[in-house]
Amino acid sequence: MKWFKYGDGMDLFADMRQEAAGEKERVVMHSQEPWCVLLVDDDEQMHQITRLALTGFKFQNRPLELISVLSGLEARKVMAERSDIALALVDVVMETEHAGLDLVRYIREELQNRQVRLVLRTGQAGQAPEDRVIKEYEIDDYKEKTELTTQKLRTLLYSMLRAYRDLCLIEDQKLGLSHVIEASANVQNTKSLQSYATAVLNQLTSLLKLHASAFYCVATPCPDSEKCNALTVATTAERVELYVESPFKGLPEDVQRRCKEVLSQRTTRDYGDAYVFFKQDERGVDSVLYVGFEQELSELDRKLLEIYMYNIGLTFENINLMVDLRETSKELVYNLANAVEARSRETGAHVQRVALYCERLAHLYGLAESEADMIKNASPLHDVGKVAIPDSILHKPGKLDAQEWAIMQKHVEYGVEILNRSKRRLMQVAKEIAATHHEKWDGSGYPNRLQGDDIPISGRITAIADVFDALGAKRSYKDPWTDEQIREELMAQKGRHFEPKLVELLLEHWDEFIAIRASLPD
């Protein structure tokens, strides 16, 4: 069975294309970055002795970068400019008797740097008693220069660098956890699943101490079995386009080949410098998690990554189900609205246009995305009550008489009655719109003669959107108005029928609304 047929989709690693082939080399280089150690002492001989004692020193296969300064003032400049100082060996007495102590206070309190390890070295212990200094200053050790032999100095560095490494890891995990929490609080659709899945993947690789390039994608087989729809939903690499089709395009050839092998063979593979996990859920949706690394994964590491795949896959499935249900409800709303419009001998394009006008006006008005989306999806039902109005009135070509007009106004009441049977948020907003979109800003509307801000914003927005579209459309009782006539009418009804701000927004963005109308002709 042939599984893959890739088109000319967007490059997944567009900005990283030239670097991608050298992924392993970049990882090795990353592991060789030196540990930055700041030497602060006004005695140049101490710098020379320290450098000699630390010749050839390495921790976790990373060398040292020794930065020498001769005063507390110089040290302040270095600490303010660099955030990668792992350890500072600080003399207590320099340009002043307490210059070293002042530097410690500056680093901890003004710079708020809690990660750098600080060790005081003094040749005059009486100037700064150890007990008082340890108690009052946030330092990690206190040494007399005479006691720091070569071996003890190297032992000190192992201890301090190990502590710095662990603090950095904890900080990374805290940041990663905050991303996970932030993302998980908003996992409501497949787009927000990206941030959630990526945050968890970053957190996981951090916990496992992997200098890894990882990405996670799902592949859905198409009915014709000739290709698959694959989407990348998580990655640890920067500048990567997420959630695009043809996710393997732009990746190094060996990575593409491995992912395709795993998907076609439906099995997890260990490639030595990369591990590619495979999973298939109950719906036949395949998932691939690619993790490139420099060290071998332990059995626990693999288990954690497999758990990640399972849970993200389950979340993805649940989110897709939720999205499917939401889209189904939208379709039902539009189908019902189209049926009402068809009975009124108006096209279904009217409710679609009104919905888009409402969404754009809501955004321009400054409403939240969720509120704008709700108004957009509820507005098609603004005239649902017309199903209860006799055809003789709905289709009358001329002007309605007083009795007919009173009956026509009843469609608001009928619409509220129909929509009130559901307690769902969408239906409640639709009820609000049906009840108020014929109210007017000056209080002369119907059915309740509401005025100004007493009219819900959903009703105010739908009112102007409905009239704007109706004026430009051919109806049984009128020909379409010209754009100039519509503009003049909106200006005339500013502060009377419509909220002034909404009129101004529509006129300021006139071309956008005309473009919407043109995109959905009757």
Curated annotation (Swiss-Prot):
Cross-referenced Pfam families: DUF3369 (PF11849), HD_5 (PF13487)
Catalytic activity as recorded in UniProt: 3',3'-cGAMP + H2O = 5'-pApG-3' + H(+)
Response regulatory domain: residues covered: 36-160
Self-association and partners: Homodimer.
Protein name: 3'3'-cGAMP-specific phosphodiesterase 2
A GO molecular-function descriptor: cyclic-nucleotide phosphodiesterase activity
Residues annotated as transmembrane: none
UniProt entry tagged with the keyword Ubl conjugation: no
PROSITE patterns: HD_GYP, RESPONSE_REGULATORY
Cofactor info, note text: Requires a divalent metal cation for activity. Likely has a bi-nuclear metal center. Has the highest enzyme activity with Mn(2+).
Species of the source: Vibrio cholerae serotype O1 (strain ATCC 39315 / El Tor Inaba N16961)
GO BP annotation list: cyclic nucleotide catabolic process; phosphorelay signal transduction system
Cofactor(s) listed in the protein's UniProt record: Mn(2+)
EC number assigned by the record: 3.1.4.-
Binding-site residues, a divalent metal cation 1: H382, D383, D466
